[in-house]
Amino acid sequence: MELKVLNTGGSETGEVVTLNDAVFSAEVSEHAMYLDVKSIMANRRQGTHKAKNRSEVRGGGRKPYRQKGTGHARQGSTRSPLMTGGGTIFGPEPRDYGLKVNKKVKKLARRSALTNKANEGGIVVVEDFVFDQIKTRQMAEVLKNLGLDSRKTLMLMPEHNDIIVRSGRNIPKLQVVVADNASTYDILDSQTVLVQKTALKKIEETLG
C-alpha cells in the first residue's frame, strides 16, 4: 500500500511512502486485539475497593442485650453483620486486576489494529514537524489543514518532543504519543492515525 506524504499545510509534498505489508497488511486477529485491549483496561483498574468485616469495624466489644429472656435471637456483638453499623459479609477486598499478555500477542494485536486502520483509509502520513514554542493554536491549525480537526486523532511522533505534546494537550480529540508507545487500544480508539514520516519507519522496525 502506498500513501502520499502531506505537509503541515495539507498539501502533497510529491513524496510517496510504501507501507510495510508485514505491519499494515497483516492477517487481522480479532482475538489478539481483544486480549490486548482487555489487559490494558484491566491494568488501569486501581483495585483499592474495600469494605470492613466484623473484626475491622470500630466498637463491638459490648454485648447488645442479655443472653436470655428478651425473646430475640442471641447476639454477642453490636458489630455483627446482622446489626446496623455492623461489618459486611463477603465485602470487596483490595485485589490486582492485572492481566498478562505475551509480547508476541501484543505485537500481533498492534499489527492487526494498524491493518484495520489502513484498510479503512484511516492512516495519514505527514512530514516531520516541530514548533518553536508551545502553541495550541498552531497544532489546531495543522489538524485543520489536514482535515482532521473534527476527527478523533492519534498522532505518532518518532521520539518525545515536549513542545509538540503540550501543544496538543488541550485539543479534546487529539492524543499525541511516541510511536513505540502507541497501544492497540489507542489505535482502535482513534478515527485517524496521523503518523510523522520518521515515526512510520520506527513502527515498521518495531513491529515488522
From Swiss-Prot:
Gene3D superfamilies: 3.40.1370.10. The keyword Acetylation does not apply. Residues 44-89 are annotated as: Disordered. GO terms for biological process: translation. GO terms for cellular component: ribonucleoprotein complex; ribosome. The keyword Ubl conjugation does not apply. One of its GO terms (molecular function) is structural constituent of ribosome. One of the primary rRNA binding proteins, this protein initially binds near the 5'-end of the 23S rRNA. It is important during the early stages of 50S assembly. It makes multiple contacts with different domains of the 23S rRNA in the assembled 50S subunit and ribosome. Forms part of the polypeptide exit tunnel. This is Large ribosomal subunit protein uL4. The lineage of its organism: Bacteria, Pseudomonadati, Chlorobiota, Chlorobiia, Chlorobiales.
